[in-house]
Design a protein with these regions (language model features):
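Alpha-helical transmembrane segments and terminal signal-anchor/GPI-anchor hydrophobic tails
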Residues: 12-15, 21-28, 148-265, 309-330, ...
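Short hydrophobic/aromatic helix or loop-helix immediately within or flanking a transmembrane segment
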Residues: 12-20, 33-55
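Loop-to-helix entry region of an early transmembrane alpha helix in multi-pass inner-membrane enzymes
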Residues: 41, 53-70
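Transmembrane-helix signature of polytopic, membrane-embedded enzymes
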Residues: 73-93
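Membrane-interface alpha helices of multi-pass inner-membrane proteins
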Residues: 95, 126-150, 246-253
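Short acidic/glycine- and proline-prone juxtamembrane loop motifs at membrane-interface regions
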Residues: 100-106
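Membrane-interface transmembrane helices that cradle and orient dolichyl/undecaprenyl
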Residues: 112-126
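Signature aromatic-anchored transmembrane alpha helix within multi-pass, membrane-resident enzymes
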Residues: 165-169, 282-303
Length: 348
């Protein structure tokens, strides 16, 4: 994906921003670095460094892809036994999304994947240093700062508590979301127009209706299955990731934009899930459930790619999410896909 040409949704926006981004020599001129434009400092510095090398946006894509996938596959090599299964699931389910849709946030996700072992081992100094780096790429990483507080509660739950504790936490946090955003907007997000708009969109968003909640819970069945098995195996680090994934998914049902917090836990979830569904003992006892969970996981991602693209007027009936990836063009066969270009314009 690093060599793609005009493929992806947010990628096209970042390419537009990059066209008028400053290089390093321009960035450090007095008054040139404008934090109010919304991008976090390390992302701005990253763009400037790439701009210093070349004006071609492909350099941003290449570095982004190298860092993100390098971290994901390096950690998979250390953590995952069934690596090929993980690669297949990642490639078909989330590879386009992480590499083209959330370029800034994907770097923060990579930082969290690297830093999670420090959280598990209680090395909070290193963990928080990595969290600061993640936050400097994407503001949503501020959420990672509270994970050490939540770890004792969400890594030891057993039985029905494994499902109840994340629900209670999520409902309490959802109740105070407006208060939390107000504090952030008056401190860390002060004078940042982009983050102010994002906060406003969160508060104005509507949650899922009953049918939406039921559908979302059905799509989370693979997660529930992993939670059930992890309780029996007693691995705290796995149980915490699964509970956090459930926790942010519930918040996302109340405030839809906040469902993106789940991005931080998707890859670690796939690490766990890839080994779990091929464990001989688990297959022997739960093969029908494993098969059902795989089908639901595939369905949930397929439904995402087949849904109409979001616009100011709701979901489009003309353009679908897969239109931003298909057909694929690389820098070696540069071609503008007019349908994709129109679809992206619809979102502005």
């Amino acid at each position: 994906m690093g060599l793609r040409f005009r493929v992806g949704g947010d990628s096209l926006r970042y390419e537009m921003y990059f066209s008028y981004a400053k290089d390093l020599s321009e960035l450090f001129v007095k008054g040139a670095w404008d934090l109010s434009e919304g991008f976090q400092p390390l992302w701005t510095l990253y763009q400037a460094a790439c701009k210093t090398i070349t004006d071609d946006f492909v350099i941003v894509q290449l570095v982004n892809s190298f860092v993100l996938n390098g971290v994901i596959f390096y950690c998979a090599a250390k953590e995952v036994r069934h690596r090929f299964t993980f690669v297949v699931l990642y490639y078909f389910l989330y590879y386009p999304y992480f590499n083209t849709e959330i370029m800034r946030e994907s770097l923060a996700v990579a930082m969290f994947i690297v830093g999670y072992r420090f959280l598990v081992n209680g090395n909070y100094v290193k963990y928080y240093l990595i969290c600061v780096v993640a936050f400097m790429f994407h503001a949503s990483a501020i959420f990672l700062m509270v994970l050490p507080v939540m770890y004792p509660f969400l890594s030891k739950s057993r039985g029905w508590k494994s499902y109840l504790v994340p629900i209670v936490f999520a409902l309490v946090v959802s109740y105070y979301v407006s208060f939390i955003l107000e504090i952030l907007n008056s401190t860390l997000f002060l004078d940042n127009a982009l983050l102010g708009d994002k906060s406003e969109s969160v508060l104005q968003s509507e949650g899922l209706n009953v049918f939406g909640i039921i559908g979302q819970l059905a799509c989370l069945f693979p997660l529930f299955f992993c939670m059930y098995i992890s309780q029996k195996r007693g691995k705290k680090s796995d149980l915490f990731i699964l509970n956090m994934y459930f926790f942010v998914s519930i918040i996302g049902m109340v405030y839809l934009p906040l469902v993106r917090l789940a991005n931080y836990f998707i890859i670690p979830f796939l690490y766990i899930y890839s080994d779990m569904i091929l464990n001989p003992e688990i297959l022997r006892k739960y093969r029908p459930i494993v098969n059902l969970s795989v089908c639901l996981l595939l369905y949930s991602r397929l439904s995402y790619y087949c849904q109409g693209m979001a616009s100011t007027e709701g979901r489009s009936k003309e353009f679908y999410m897969y239109d931003i990836y298909i057909p694929y063009h690389s820098v070696f066969d540069k071609e503008y896909d007019m349908k994709r270009e129109r679809a992206i314009e619809l979102q502005f």
